[in-house]
Regions:
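Short phosphate-coordinating micro-motif centered on Lys-Gly-acidic
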Residues: 25-30, 35-77
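Nucleotide and nucleotide-moiety/phosphate-recognizing core
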Residues: 1-25, 31-32, 55-61
C-alpha cells in the first residue's frame, strides 16, 4: 500500500503516510488521488523525489536520516 491514513483519536491531526518508493514516474502521484487525503492533514512522504518532491510547498520540512559514526542522525532542513 502506497498511502496509509491515521486519524484521530490515535493522533492529534490526520496523518497521511505516503511511501513513494514504488512509483516509476512522478506523474503517477495524480493517479493516487493524494490531494483527496491531504486537506487538514500532515503528509509524511518517504522517497519524495519519486513523487517529484515537495520542497516547493509551504510549511515543507525535510528530514533526512543518515548513517553516523554511532548509529544514525536526522538532518532537518
Amino acid at each position: 500500500q502506497i498511502i496509509e491514513v491515521y486519524d484521530p483519536p490515535g493522533v492529534r491531526l490526520p496523518v497521511v503516510h505516503a511511501d513513494f518508493y514504488r512509483l516509476d514516474h512522478p506523474d503517477e502521484v495524480e493517479q493516487l488521488g493524494l490531494d483527496d487525503y491531504r486537506l487538514g492533514a500532515a503528509l509524511l512522504a518517504e522517497w519524495p523525489d519519486h513523487a517529484g518532491g515537495f520542497a516547493h510547498e509551504p510549511a515543507c520540512l525535510s528530514i533526512r536520516i543518515e548513517n553516523a559514526e554511532k548509529g544514525r542522525q536526522a538532518i532537518v532542513e
